[in-house]
Amino acid sequence: NLKDAVQIQQMRQLTDQGVDGLIVCCSNPVALNPTIEYAYGKGVPTASMTGYLTSEYAISTSVNYKLTGYYIAQWLAETIGGEGNVVIMEGIPGTSASDSQHQGMLDGFAEYPDITVVAEIAHMWTPQIAQAELQKWLSANTIEVDGFAVQSSGESGALNALESSGRPMVPMALGGEIGAFCYWRNNPDFIDRAIYAWPPGDDAEFAMNVLLRTMYGQGLKIQSILVPPYEEDVETIQSFVPEDCDRNSSEFRTVGIENWASDEYLNNFFDNGEALL
C-alpha cells in the first residue's frame, strides 16, 4: 500500500492473529524496523520484496536496484551517443528501491561529461502521475531533451506525455509495462532493449520462495539476496504483445521465476537449499 503507517498497523495485527510469516513491499528502509523486531520476537519472520530493509531481523529480496539504475543510465547514454540532455524520472523518494535506482542512474550518467541531467521528476510509481508531471515539465521548459531514464511503473505515462507534447520520440527506458511495450512493439526502432527492475509477479514469487525456504529450515546464509536486472529485445516483446495491443494497459510483463530468481540460483544462499516443489 506504500504507506508505512498502514503497513505497520497491518503487520502488528497479522502477527497478533498468528500468521507464520510476513512479506512487505516497497518500504522506507527504517520505518518498519520496530515492527519487524516485534514480529521476530513472536517467531514471525519478515521478508521484503522490491527494496531492502535495514532491520537485522528482516530478509531482503530484490533486484540490485543501484546496479539497475547504473545499467539504465549507461544504456541510455550510449544510445544517444554519449552526449545530450536527459531527464530522470524516479519513483517514490524515500523508499529504498527508488532511492537506490535513482542514485545508480546519477552515478551512471556522471561517467559521461557531455551528458547533462536537466530534470529529476518523481512519478510516485504511478503512470497517471508520470504523465501529468512530465507534461507539466515539458510545457514549462523548452530545452531539448535527448533521452528519458524512467523507473519502471511510470513509463507508459511518460510515453503518453512525450507523444502528446509534439516533441521527437527520443529514447526512453522501459521496464515491463505492457502499455509502453505496445508502443515499442509497433515502433521497433524506438529502443533496442528493455531493462527489468521488478517484474511484480516474479518479484513476489522470489520473496515468497525465500521466506518459505527460511521457514522450512533450509538455513539462510545471508540476510539479503539480490538478482541482476533482466533484459529483453523487441523481437521477444513482439512474441507476446499483439499488434492490436492496448497502449493504456496496466499489466506488467512476467519473465518467469526461472529467469528472475531460479531454484538453482537460490540454492546458493541456503545451507541445505532445495526446490520447494
Where are these regions (language model features)?
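Hydrophobic alpha-helical segments within soluble ligand-binding/sensing domains
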Residues: 7, 60-86, 100, 129-131, ...
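Exported/periplasmic ABC-transporter solute-binding proteins
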Residues: 146-150, 156-210, 214-228, 233-237, ...
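Second-shell loop/turn segments in exported
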Residues: 55-63, 92-95, 118-123, 144-146, ...
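Short, solvent-exposed amphipathic alpha-helices that sit
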Residues: 68-72, 96-116, 129, 133, ...
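Hydrophobic alpha-helical
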Residues: 11-40, 105, 119, 123-184
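Flexible loop/hinge segments that line or gate small-molecule binding clefts
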Residues: 29-67, 78, 85, 177-191
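Short beta-strand elements in bilobed, periplasmic/extracellular small-molecule ligand-binding domains
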Residues: 1, 58, 85-90, 106-128
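Hinge/cleft segment of the Venus flytrap/periplasmic-binding protein
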Residues: 97, 108, 112, 199-277
